[in-house]
Swiss-Prot record:
<comment type="similarity">
    <text>Belongs to the GatB/GatE family. GatB subfamily.</text>
</comment>
<dbReference type="InterPro" id="IPR006075">
    <property type="entry name" value="Asn/Gln-tRNA_Trfase_suB/E_cat"/>
</dbReference>
<dbReference type="Pfam" id="PF02934">
    <property type="entry name" value="GatB_N"/>
</dbReference>
<dbReference type="InterPro" id="IPR004413">
    <property type="entry name" value="GatB"/>
</dbReference>
<dbReference type="GO" id="GO:0050566">
    <property type="term" value="F:asparaginyl-tRNA synthase (glutamine-hydrolyzing) activity"/>
</dbReference>
<comment type="subunit">
    <text>Heterotrimer of A, B and C subunits.</text>
</comment>
<keyword id="KW-0648">Protein biosynthesis</keyword>
<dbReference type="InterPro" id="IPR042114">
    <property type="entry name" value="GatB_C_1"/>
</dbReference>
<dbReference type="GO" id="GO:0070681">
    <property type="term" value="P:glutaminyl-tRNAGln biosynthesis via transamidation"/>
</dbReference>
<dbReference type="GO" id="GO:0005524">
    <property type="term" value="F:ATP binding"/>
</dbReference>
<dbReference type="InterPro" id="IPR014746">
    <property type="entry name" value="Gln_synth/guanido_kin_cat_dom"/>
</dbReference>
<comment type="function">
    <text>Allows the formation of correctly charged Asn-tRNA(Asn) or Gln-tRNA(Gln) through the transamidation of misacylated Asp-tRNA(Asn) or Glu-tRNA(Gln) in organisms which lack either or both of asparaginyl-tRNA or glutaminyl-tRNA synthetases. The reaction takes place in the presence of glutamine and ATP through an activated phospho-Asp-tRNA(Asn) or phospho-Glu-tRNA(Gln).</text>
</comment>
<dbReference type="GO" id="GO:0050567">
    <property type="term" value="F:glutaminyl-tRNA synthase (glutamine-hydrolyzing) activity"/>
</dbReference>
<dbReference type="InterPro" id="IPR023168">
    <property type="entry name" value="GatB_Yqey_C_2"/>
</dbReference>
<dbReference type="GO" id="GO:0006412">
    <property type="term" value="P:translation"/>
</dbReference>
<dbReference type="InterPro" id="IPR003789">
    <property type="entry name" value="Asn/Gln_tRNA_amidoTrase-B-like"/>
</dbReference>
<keyword id="KW-0436">Ligase</keyword>
Length: 494
């Protein structure tokens, strides 16, 4: 159970505080080369109606055949969500009419889903964490796509997406703010990307959310919920929740009642609008699909899949903190995307002394590399600085060959020109000066030239930093800062 909502999370209305209650249904496209019940391709971006089998087009007499890879991916996702795997599940027909649904029904799972209850720990931006319950995960077919812009008076249907396998992941109503909802979706996306069960590409529609929102006075029973369909970005999920909560509060404070309905989010206006009244389960007339046998597998089959799971983000974060002394925040940043965690681990693999340089490597990946990638609008996969090059820079700092200031200059050279960092340091004379006699002359000159500052630093030792800065400036950043600091203290009698 989650802790009571903090007062700061409550929404202030004209007549008092309100609590928003949120549950999410995430539709995640299964990473598979073929559709759920046919051999048609699932690749995004093909010409219209080119990835359509006779099964997908619902031609008479065509029978569905289950794709085992989709079943495996659903089980692996369930295991990644710490959920119960049902060894027997059933496919049902969900009956409704829509032009992009050629069968006149959707093959889904109703009473007996493949995955039961689970939970996900979600870290929040404010440093807190919450546990969000998972109600179920089931497999179902995606529908086709209506095209309204191809003809002035007609709508066309593209069935490329029809029959593509989806995992619908239903949360419990455990979320209490738009920030929590966004963090939850991000965490689910990260887990599935680590598992390789969904690519999480929201721009291509691989991950979509139906957002259920209701409001109530703190401590009162749940209010009437509205469902906002097919929200396709994490930012829009937050905006839709904020608007919908305010809309419902406004109605209730004016003495009205909330209609249970399905709504759409208009991203251009930042508001939701009514689509239709919300259906109940009986409206869909679910019944077991007579063309498909129940799915049955053994516990040994599930155990084999569990044994083959990769290290997931929570475990990886804990290892980074324990083994390399990273802060929880830094470890969280590194594991938030599979690619960034893999890059950091590739840097670690190149280090001779991971205990000494592991934390420094994390700082460089997060601050220097990520900062520059964001500035240039590049992904980590296209980084001009490789893991091996970054590891070499980190080692040069760790062993005292170059200073932090020189390391940033070296990073810039490697970013723009390439090359081996150690060779560049030798060729360009970038080594840190550790010869005390060479540093001592610079120190003596600066002390002699600033008698007024010497008098001040004796009275106010914090001013020592000014002298260190002057020495570093005179040496072009090559002097060893610690050696400079120690030498100045001795010269000034501090």
């Amino acid at each position: 159970m989650n802790a009571p909502v903090k007062p700061s999370k409550l929404i202030k209305g004209a007549t008092g505080d309100w609590e928003v209650v949120i549950g999410l249904e995430i539709h995640a496209q299964v990473s598979s080369n073929a559709k759920l019940f046919s051999g048609a391709a699932t690749a995004f971006g093909g010409d219209q109606n080119t990835h359509v089998s006779l099964v997908d087009a619902a031609m008479p007499g065509m029978l569905p055949v289950i794709n085992e890879e989709c079943v495996r991916q659903a089980i692996r996702s369930g295991l990644g969500l710490n959920a119960k795997i049902h060894l027997r599940s059933v496919f049902d027909r969900k009956n409704y009419f829509y032009p992009d649904l050629p069968q006149g029904y959707q093959i889904s799972q109703y009473k007996s889903p493949i995955v039961g209850e689970g939970e996900v720990v979600v870290d929040l931006p404010d440093g807190d964490s919450i546990t969000v319950g998972i109600e179920r995960l089931h497999l179902e077919q995606d529908a086709g796509k209506l095209l309204h812009d191809q003809h002035p008076t007609s709508t066309f249907v593209d069935l490329n997406r029809s029959g593509v396998a989806l995992m619908e992941i239903v949360s419990k109503p455990d979320l209490r703010s738009s920030e929590q909802a966004k963090a939850y979706v991000s965490k689910l996306r990260t887990i599935m990307r680590y598992l390789g069960t969904c690519d999480g590409d929201m721009e291509k529609g691989s991950l979509r959310a139906d957002v259920n929102v209701s409001v109530r006075r703190p401590g009162e029973p749940y209010g009437t919920r509205c469902e906002i369909k097919n929200v396709n970005s994490i930012r829009f999920i937050g905006q839709a929740i904020e608007y919908e909560a305010r809309r419902q509060i406004g109605i209730l404070e004016d003495g009205g009642t909330i209609d249970q309905e399905t709504r759409l989010f208009d991203a251009n206006k930042g508001e939701t609008r009514s689509m239709r009244s919300k259906e109940e389960a009986h409206d869909y007339r679910y019944f077991p699909d007579p063309d498909l046998l129940p799915l049955e597998f053994t516990q040994a089959y599930v155990d084999d899949l569990k044994a083959g799971l990769p290290e997931l983000p929570d475990a990886k974060k804990e290892r980074f903190v324990h083994d390399f002394g990273l802060s929880v925040e830094d470890a969280g940043v590194l594991v938030s995307e599979r690619e960034s965690a893999e890059f950091y681990e590739a840097v670690l693999a190149q280090l001779k002394d991971q205990g000494r340089d592991g934390k420094l490597a994390a700082n460089w990946v997060i601050n220097e590399l990520f900062g520059r990638l964001n500035k240039d609008g590049q992904s980590i996969d296209a980084s001009p600085v490789s893991a091996a090059q970054l590891a070499a820079i980190v080692e040069l700092i760790g062993e005292g060959t170059i200073s932090g200031k020189i390391a940033k200059e070296l990073f810039e050279i490697v970013w723009t020109e390439g090359g081996d960092p150690r060779t560049l340091v030798e060729q360009r004379g970038m080594k840190q000066v550790t010869d005390l006699s060479a540093i001592e002359k610079v120190v003596d000159d600066i002390v002699a030239a600033n008698p007024d500052k010497v008098a001040q630093v004796v009275a106010k030792p914090a001013m020592l930093g000014w002298f260190v800065g002057q020495v570093m400036k005179s040496s072009g950043g090559k002097a060893n800062p610690q050696a400079v600091n120690d030498l100045l203290k001795r010269k000034l009698g501090l």
